[in-house]
Amino acid sequence: MQLSDLNKYCDKALESYATHAQPIYPGTVVTAPWVRLKCQYGCGGYGKRYGCPPDTPTPEQTQAVIDCYQRAILFHIESIPGSKEKGGRRVLKFFDMLVDLEGEMFKDGYYKALLFLAGPCHLCKECAKGKGEPCLHGDRARPAMEAVGIDVYQTVRNNGFFIETLKEKGDPKNLYALMLVD
């Protein structure tokens, strides 16, 4: 199987909201135990949403899943605070498009297509987990790369994409999503 077989899906993402999309080898995806600790100590969403730790796979489980794949796609979107995005709606539409793309890839025969997004889930204003109820959007909810222990910074850099820590609140954000394919 060729990485180039995935170009049509990259093109679809680029036609929608993606800034960049590139087929990659899963061996370039880095997992590490410290990543999950950054969620636990530093993110207010820890334990409050089904898409956040501790309700997500561990880095070790994630690495075992990644090892089952030969190809993947890395997607990038630049989010500029204060732009015409109206509170990040463009980013949310991007994530929604990627979930649809995952379904399309499944229908095209990529039955192992598996998507990881960025940041905490925002499908509901208030996650049903807080009420002890099941996820209301289990068909569309996807965990973030960082929530499953993927070192987004190193993974992105391994594949020639740009990323750096934010220096100021108003700095452009570079958000990434990962689709494991086969």
List each language-model region with its residue ranges.
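Catalytic cores of enzyme domains
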Residues: 3-6, 20-22, 28-49, 54-182
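Short alpha-helix
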Residues: 10
